[in-house]
Structures are given as structure tokens and as C-alpha cells.
Amino acid sequence: MRGFRIVIAGHGTLPAALLATTELICGEIPDLAAVGLSASESPDHYAEGLRATIGRDHRPVLVLCDLLGGTPFNVASAIGRRSPRVVCIAGANLAMAVEAALADGDLDDALVERLIEVGRAGIVETERHRARRVS
């Protein structure tokens, strides 16, 4: 059983689409939420929504952010600096979201490293990937 909640944070409708696609692959995922930053939304307003979604129930929260240095990541990181139960990873992709959704256990350093590895491993250029598999 997963001992943490997951929030997907990012620009526009990407977080909602990533959530929907994760659930398409995995089935309904408890404690999975998405918070997208709209083009007209201020960083302060976005921060209010993200804080409300993260909540205050003292359970650990993994925030998967779309872009390092973007407003969603900056806001999530600021929240994480004030709350050690919040862990942020930038550069989130579908492989990472699926791996996190299916994870058992706690949100610890080993899981964070595994999620980053899974995310990186899924980024390949097909011809080079095929050539490596053939040789």
C-alpha cells in the first residue's frame, strides 16, 4: 500500500492529462490529484490552490512537476522547503507518474531515486535505442 499522496503540478492542462492517462493505464488511483496553472492565473493564486490540494493532513506528498524553474515547480518547492513531508521532482513524465502510482511503501530517498531513474530511462531516441538493442 502506498503511504503517500501524489500531486501532479504543471502548466495548463498537462497535469490533468497526465493524471487521466496514469489512471487509464493503472485504473483509478486514490490520493492522486492534478493542479494546472492557467495562462491568466497569478503565481499567488496558483500557490493557494496547490497548498489547498497538498493539504494539511500530515501525510507525505510527492509533487511531480512538469518543468524545472517553472511557476508550478517554484511554488511547490517553496511549499516543500517549509514542509519536510512534501517532496518535489521536476521533469515529470508518464513513466514516473505510473511508477509512483503503483509504488508500495513510503516516500523515501530510494523511491525518489527510482522515479528519477524510470523517468530518464524512458527518454530515448528510437534509432539509437534500436541500434543498442541489436548490437
Regions found by a protein language model. Name each.
Residues M1-S135:
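N-terminal loops that bind phosphate or other acidic moieties
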